[in-house]
């Protein structure tokens, strides 16, 4: 007799990570349920989704969101809760409120604090002797206005999908930002100032079992899309990067998914780490390369001790067609560019030659044609609205600074 599949609840359904996790889980024979503040979220349109539960946005109302999730877990007899975005941080803060029998893989809140904030991450990397660009944390206008080479990057303490990141190329841009930061009291939480370096952006994704690395994947951004995201990805293999990720996860005794961005310095080849995402990130390139991050996370969540997965195949080129359309529309706001991009994606020509679709896999999950059609129609009607799609999605799943303060209050009152 085949054992029953666990009942899985994903923490949101609007992000690209959620959409891809749904595909990977579905192809493995699972059916999932979603929590979403958006009734027509991207994840809804899948043959692998059984139900979408309405809940407040975790960023706008973390208390209401948590209450809704706990009610869903109880009434739907959920076995596993998979945090596919920043809700992992929320659940870590609310750990004592989660049912004892619920399967969920979470590191301690103290470990999250070391990677959730960009300033804390920089301190962690320095302590572990992990390469990073020349970095400093500034907490005053005077420090920010000090002399330093241009260009450089400024990063807010918290941000997702490349929000809260500014590239400063000269004194005029620096002074404009300085005025804004003083007005918004941004120096109170510390701002990360980081030197710009030349090189390819690569991302590494991992799953840990109480500090033991069990799955790791790396890919290179071949083509950048809206908000600094990816349109094209190329899988790569790097033993030194895997060793660095393993060292960080071991030091934090990490449990669950953990991802990093780094720049491979063009001059030295050194991987300089620049950002962390304490969660599962877009797992389809890994899956198509032979690394099952989502499956590993599910096993760990169920309390199993999975074997260590080998590196995947290098050279697997994947595309996010939906992001390619938004990218084409945002550049010059022209319908002809959108139509040309549709043709290139459909025929796998131009920059899409040799790629496999990872975000909207029409052949395996035909339901995704509905949101894809909506986006295409809207972009052909008004190409200048491309940015709104990403902004709406990010607002549905990201944590605001106010929400983060609320989560910390939960911790302090526990």
Regions inferred by a protein language model and the residue ranges of each:
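Active-site nucleotide/adenylate-binding loops and adjacent lid/helix of ATP-dependent enzymes
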Residues: 112-192, 198-199, 210-212, 238-243, ...
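Glycine-rich phosphate/pyrophosphate-binding beta-alpha loops
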Residues: 162, 222-227, 232-233, 277-291
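Active-site "cap" helix and flanking loop/linker of ATP-utilizing ligase/carboxylase catalytic domains
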Residues: 237-262, 278-332
């Amino acid at each position: 007799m085949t054992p029953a599949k666990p009942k899985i609840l994903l923490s949101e359904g609007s992000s690209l990570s959620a959409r891809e996790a749904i595909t990977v889980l579905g192809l493995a024979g699972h059916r999932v349920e979603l929590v979403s503040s958006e009734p027509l979220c991207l994840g809804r349109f899948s043959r692998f989704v059984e139900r979408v539960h309405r809940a407040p946005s975790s960023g706008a109302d973390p208390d209401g969101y948590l209450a809704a999730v706990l009610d869903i877990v109880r009434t739907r007899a959920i076995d596993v809760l998979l945090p596919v975005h920043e809700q992992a941080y929320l659940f870590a803060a609310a750990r004592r409120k989660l049912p004892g029998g619920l399967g969920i893989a979470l590191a301690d809140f103290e470990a999250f604090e070391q990677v959730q904030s960009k300033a804390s991450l920089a301190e962690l990397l320095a302590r572990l002797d992990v390469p990073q660009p020349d970095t400093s944390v500034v907490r005053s206008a005077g420090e920010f206005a000090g002399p330093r080479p241009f260009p450089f990057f400024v990063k807010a303490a918290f941000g997702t999908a490349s929000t809260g990141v500014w590239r400063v190329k000269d004194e005029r841009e620096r002074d404009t930002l300085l005025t804004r930061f003083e007005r918004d009291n941004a120096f109170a939480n510390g701002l990360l100032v980081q030197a710009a370096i030349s090189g390819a952006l690569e991302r590494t994704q991992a799953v840990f079992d109480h500090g033991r690395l069990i799955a790791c994947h790396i890919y290179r951004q071949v083509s950048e899309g809206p908000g600094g995201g990816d349109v094209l990805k190329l899988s790569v293999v790097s033993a030194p990067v895997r060793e660095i990720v393993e060292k960080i996860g071991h030091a934090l005794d990490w449990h669950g998914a953990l991802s990093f961005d780094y720049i491979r310095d063009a001059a030295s080849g050194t991987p300089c780490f620049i950002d962390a995402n304490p969660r599962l990130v877009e797992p389809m390139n890994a899956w198509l390369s032979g690394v099952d991050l989502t499956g590993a996370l599910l096993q760990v969540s169920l309390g199993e001790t999975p074997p260590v997965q080998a590196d995947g195949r290098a050279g697997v080129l994947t595309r996010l067609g939906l992001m390619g359309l938004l990218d084409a529309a945002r550049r010059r706001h022209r319908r002809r560019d959108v139509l040309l991009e549709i043709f290139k994606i459909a025929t796998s020509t131009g920059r899409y030659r040799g790629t496999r679709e990872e975000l909207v896999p029409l052949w395996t999950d035909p339901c995704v044609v509905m949101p894809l059609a909506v986006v295409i129609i809207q972009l052909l009607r008004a190409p200048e609205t491309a940015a709104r799609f990403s902004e709406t999605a990010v607002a549905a799943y990201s944590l605001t600074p106010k929400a983060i303060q609320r989560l910390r209050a939960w911790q302090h009152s526990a």
